[in-house]
Regions:
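Active-site core of metal-dependent hydrolases
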Residues: 1-85, 102
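Short gly/ser/thr-rich secondary-structure transition/capping motifs
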Residues: 2-3, 119-122, 147
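Short Asp/Glu-rich motifs
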Residues: 8-10, 59, 118, 151, ...
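Short secondary-structure transition/capping segments
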Residues: 22, 43-54, 73, 96-102, ...
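His/Asp/Glu-enriched, well-ordered alpha-helical/loop segment
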Residues: 60-142
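A short, hydrophobic/aromatic-rich structural module that often spans a beta strand
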Residues: 127-130, 185-192
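C-terminal cap of metal-dependent C-N hydrolases
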Residues: 135-188
């Protein structure tokens, strides 16, 4: 996709057999669907759908993975930082797109961005809420004024969630996000 770069087709992707097929939906120029299908059906590696890629192809990859019962292969990316800059809402945008247009439940799309990505990238101490894992949490809710009946329904309708708080290593790092609409409900820290 970058000026001066060479084409990498399905044959090369399958021969290299990298852990993750990064930019499976291009960046923004995607391979033809026949080659995407070949990568998905002949390969067994993780399939990274990126925010800066071809959205139609991202939905095609998601559908192929669903048909094959291989949603555990889907991970999300933003291509950030890159020539297109930092994408502060990239992951939220791509998971909202997959949930609202791709026919997967929002909670499954959140798993693509968290548990699947942590497992594939071997981040063993994060990606899921479990004793012994890092306490890195994003508290979110339906955005004020957005359509839907709660967070998941709102995301299913294509609305970005409102971020109310971010906790890293068990410590509050920030409250309301400056990049998302305000959350309907905001967490409260109770000290005992």
């Amino acid at each position: 996709s970058l000026p001066g770069s060479g084409r990498i087709g399905a044959d090369v992707v399958l021969e290299v057999d990298a852990d993750i097929v990064a930019h499976v939906n291009g960046g923004p120029t995607a391979l033809p669907e026949a080659e995407i299908r070949q990568i998905c059906e002949k390969g067994s590696r993780a399939l990274e759908i990126v925010h800066n890629g071809n959205l139609r192809t991202g939905l095609f990859v998601l559908d192929l993975a669903r048909q094959r019962g291989e949603l555990s292969r889907i991970v999300l990316g933003t291509d950030s930082p890159a020539g297109s800059g930092v994408q502060p809402l990239g992951i939220l945008r791509i998971l909202t797109m997959l949930a609202s247009l791709g026919g997967v439940a929002p909670e499954v799309a959140f798993c693509f961005a968290s548990g699947n990505t942590a497992r594939v990238r071997k981040l063993h101490d994060r990606g899921m809420i479990e004793v012994g894992r890092a306490a890195d949490l994003i508290f979110m809710d339906q955005a004020i004024g957005g359509a839907g009946d709660g967070l998941l329904d709102s995301v299913a309708q294509g609305n970005l969630p409102g971020i109310g708080m971010v906790v890293i290593d068990g410590l509050v790092q920030t409250r309301r996000s400056r990049n998302t609409p305000p959350a309907m409900r905001v967490p409260e820290v109770i000290q005992g």
